[in-house]
UniProtKB/Swiss-Prot annotation:
UniProt GO BP: DNA recombination; DNA repair; SOS response
PROSITE patterns to which the protein is assigned, alphabetical: RECA_1 (PS00321), RECA_2 (PS50162), RECA_3 (PS50163)
Annotated function: Can catalyze the hydrolysis of ATP in the presence of single-stranded DNA, the ATP-dependent uptake of single-stranded DNA by duplex DNA, and the ATP-dependent hybridization of homologous single-stranded DNAs. It interacts with LexA causing its activation and leading to its autocatalytic cleavage.
Signal sequence coordinates: none
Record's protein name: Protein RecA
Gene Ontology CC annotations of this record: cytosol
Highest taxon, organism lineage: Bacteria
GO molecular function terms attached to this record: ATP binding; ATP hydrolysis activity; ATP-dependent DNA damage sensor activity; damaged DNA binding; single-stranded DNA binding
Source organism: Clostridioides difficile (strain 630) (Peptoclostridium difficile)
Keywords, alphabetical: ATP-binding, Cytoplasm, DNA damage, DNA recombination, DNA repair, DNA-binding, Nucleotide-binding, SOS response
Protein localization: Cytoplasm
Binding site for ATP: G67, P68, E69, S70, S71, G72, K73, T74
Amino acid sequence: MSVDQEKLKALNEALGKIEKDFGKGSVMKLGEATSMSIDVISTGAIGLDIAIGIGGLPRGRIVEVYGPESSGKTTVALSCVASAQKDGGIAAFIDAEHALDPVYAKALGVDVDNLIISQPDTGEQALEIAEALIRSGAIDIIVIDSVAALVPKAEIDGDMGDSHVGLQARLMSQALRKLTGSIKKSNCVAIFINQLREKVGIMFGNPETTTGGRALKFYSSVRLDVRKIDTIKQGDKVIGSRTRVKVVKNKVAPPFKQAEFDIMYGEGISKIGDLLDIAADVDIVKKSGSWYSYNDTKLGQGRENVKKFLEDNLDLTTEIDEKVRAFYNLNEEHEESGTSVSKEIVEE
C-alpha cells in the first residue's frame, strides 16, 4: 500500500527539522541498520557471551549484575573490564562499597594502573561522578559497585534511627532517567552491581528482591543473576567455586539462557575450563568417559589435566576457541528486531 505523497513530504520536512535542531541520528527508521548497530564488550567467559546471545554485553546499554554475597558478581564485572581494556578501551570503577582489591583485580587481567577509580562518600556523589565520566564520551565501560552502597546524603547526615523510606529508590530513579541517554550517546557499557534482600511476609513465590527500587529493573537491557552452585576442592583445600549465571532479562536476544563456569580463587574465571566445557558440549572436543580428544590429538584424561594441557598449548586452544565461536556465529553479524547487531570479539 503506497504512502500518500503529501504525508511523505510533511514527514521528511519534520525529520529534517528534528535533525537540524537535535543532531543527526536523533530520529530514524528502525530498519536503518547502520544507525542501529550494537557493538559489544566480551564478558571474558565464552559461555556467558553465548548465553547473552550477541557475544557479550551490549554497548550503550545498562546492565545489572546481582546475586547473593560472594557469588562472583564483582569478578564477572572485573572480567568485563579486563576484556574492554585488552581491546584498547578505557574503564572506570565507582567503588561505593570501598572494597575493591587491586591485587585481585590485577590477577583477573585488569590494567589497574589505567583503571579510573572513585570511592565516593554519598550516593549522589557517586552517580554525579558516573554521569560526568559517561558524558565525556571517553569511557568504554563503567562499573558501579554496588547499588546498595549508594546511600543518599540525607541518610548519611541523619541520625542512626531516622526513617528514610524510599529515598534510595527515588535517587536511583532520578539518576537513571538522566544517565540512560548519555550512556547510549557515549556507546558505553554501564554495569550496576546489586545485592539481594528478602521481602518480609512473602508466603508464596520468590521472596528475593534487589535493592534500590524498581527503576534499575526497567532501565537495564540485560540482567544477570549470579549464583555459586558448588565448591571446587583440591583434596581438602577449597580452590574455587562453580558459578551459574542466568540471563533473566535480555532486550537484545532471547532471555533465560544460562552459563556455568569455574571461578578460581586468586585467578578469576577459568576461561580455558569454560572453553573446554562448551567445546565438549558441541562435540568440537570429543569426550569418551574421562578422556578428551580433539581431531587426532589426545588431550588427556580428566578435566583438570586437560585444562593444564591446553594452558601449555595455546595454539591449539586458540584453534578450538575459533571453532566454538564459528559454531555459535559469534564472529558474524546477527539480526535483532530487524536491526544489524555487530560485535567486537575480544581475544582471550
